[in-house]
Amino acid sequence: MSRRADGRADDELREVRITRGFTTHPAGSVLVEFGQTRVMCTASVTEGVPAWRRDSGLGWLTAEYAMLPAATHTRSGRESVKGRVGGRTQEISRLVGRSLRACIDLAAIGENTIAIDCDVLQADGGTRTAAITGAYVALADAVTWLGAAGALADPQPISCAIAAVSVGVVDGRVRLDLPYEEDSRAEVDMNVVATDTGTLVEIQGTGEGATFPRSTLDKLLDAALAGCEQLFAVQKEALALPYPGVLPEPAEPAKRK
């Protein structure tokens, strides 16, 4: 099997690292690294839900994604300064939210909101898939925090793990976890979000330079699901460690007058 520019085999992930407790204030805070791509993922818990969700007994999970101005070789202006959020940013924010809502029972968290924030510190391809993979771990820590606070109706509201990875056809070969150098010239580019139960959450795929046959799609999915299995193992190893911060005390029941 031929080696890629970074020395990896076609079916090999970049080195993946997940660091919990990266910052101290959110209920969940993770630094996820896929090679040179680095994303900070936080999960903050707030009491209450959006107006359209009130009195439903259901919680909510929302997500925002953004890139720091110097995350790439050429500095980009902050979208907050521009006064509008770009289409790519909105698309990825919604993707992260959809992906994580697929694994959590929102009825179990009561009328609370979990806000996921994914900030790309350094980009070298695969930022959205790294964001989803790291945000799942931050979400798991936020659920632990809610459990300690006595806010869960179900002690285990997360039904499965969620991970995501990019795959593509580069130089005529199916390759896993594309860095920018490969992503920018891929003939086929695809992002796959999957669960550890073997099901798919979302597939985003495009023939960038040409069409591709069903057989190539099958090979891309096989490579992506094999990559996700490795990511689930990294997530599991990270979450095997104790909660990295200070957990809240359960709220005391109100005293009768």
UniProtKB/Swiss-Prot annotation:
It comes from the Bacteria. Transmembrane segments: none annotated. Its EC number is 2.7.7.56. GO terms for molecular function: 3'-5'-RNA exonuclease activity; tRNA binding; tRNA nucleotidyltransferase activity. Keywords: Nucleotidyltransferase, RNA-binding, rRNA processing, Transferase, tRNA processing, tRNA-binding. It catalyses: tRNA(n+1) + phosphate = tRNA(n) + a ribonucleoside 5'-diphosphate. CDD domains: RNase_PH_bact (cd11362). Phosphate binds at R88, G126, T127, R128. It holds the Pfam family RNase_PH. It is an enzyme of class 2 (transferase). One of its GO terms (biological process) is rRNA processing. Belongs to the RNase PH family. Phosphorolytic 3'-5' exoribonuclease that plays an important role in tRNA 3'-end maturation. Removes nucleotide residues following the 3'-CCA terminus of tRNAs; can also add nucleotides to the ends of RNA molecules by using nucleoside diphosphates as substrates, but this may not be physiologically important. Probably plays a role in initiation of 16S rRNA degradation (leading to ribosome degradation) during starvation. Homohexameric ring arranged as a trimer of dimers. This is Ribonuclease PH. It comes from Nocardia farcinica (strain IFM 10152). The gene is rph.
